[in-house]
Amino acid sequence: MFDRIDVAGEIQMTSQDSAKLHGIFSIPVYIAKRDSDLTSNEEKDISSIVKEGMGKNTGNSVSENSYIFNDKLEKIKEFCEQQLKIYVEQVIVPKKEVDFYITQSWLNITKPGEYHHLHTHQNSIISGVFYIAAEEDDKITFSDPNTKLKGMIKFEKKAYNTVNSDTWWFPSIANELVLFPSWLNHQVNVNEKATKDRISISFNTFARGKFGLRKDLNELILK
């Protein structure tokens, strides 16, 4: 079962005990905690990746090596793959056998005063971020793709929830993994209280197997 899954689900109405508000067409953001802390070998791998070179990104830095899971951080990769499998089985629920796998993977370093621009991940189905180091008030913020449609008429709100918000954030916690649809816009705002570097691993995924249906003329077989 999910360690924690955040979607717009049932919201209890305060006015009537028998009334419920249903959030349909929810966007699944999955968060899972790894039991073990960073090992000394993993710390060495992180240092090695940094020494290989860091390039400038819009607002922060990313590793020159964009396939870090290929030969480093084996246990973290294994954990991410296990959680990816759970996400696929319980969110996508594919009828046919489909093999999801990690494609590119890279290290992010966000120093105090830096940020990570609003973006999506192209050529990917599910994306993930695993936090190596984070401080209090570090967070990842997601943006509702339907904001333009829902915002045709604006109201001032006295409280925010997953139904009436244009953005929603989750705290960034060391040893936690966040999985989300690759098309979902997300960003990292400046943490004004930061005193240390925020370090994370991001990755993309794709799948092998059968997509679609032959009778609908949208079947795709990837091996």
Features from the language model and the residues they span:
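Non-heme Fe(II)/2-oxoglutarate
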Residues: F2-P94, Y115, E219-L222
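Short conserved micro-motifs at the rims of enzyme active sites and ligand-binding pockets
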Residues: E43-K44, N191, G212-K215
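Conserved double-stranded beta-helix
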Residues: K75-K139
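Catalytic core of non-heme Fe(II) oxygenases with the double-stranded beta-helix
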Residues: T110-L179, K210-E219
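A short hydrophobic beta-strand segment most commonly corresponding to one strand
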Residues: S127-F130, T195-F211
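Exposed beta-sheet edge/beta-hairpin loop segments within beta-rich domains
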Residues: W168-P171, V190-A194
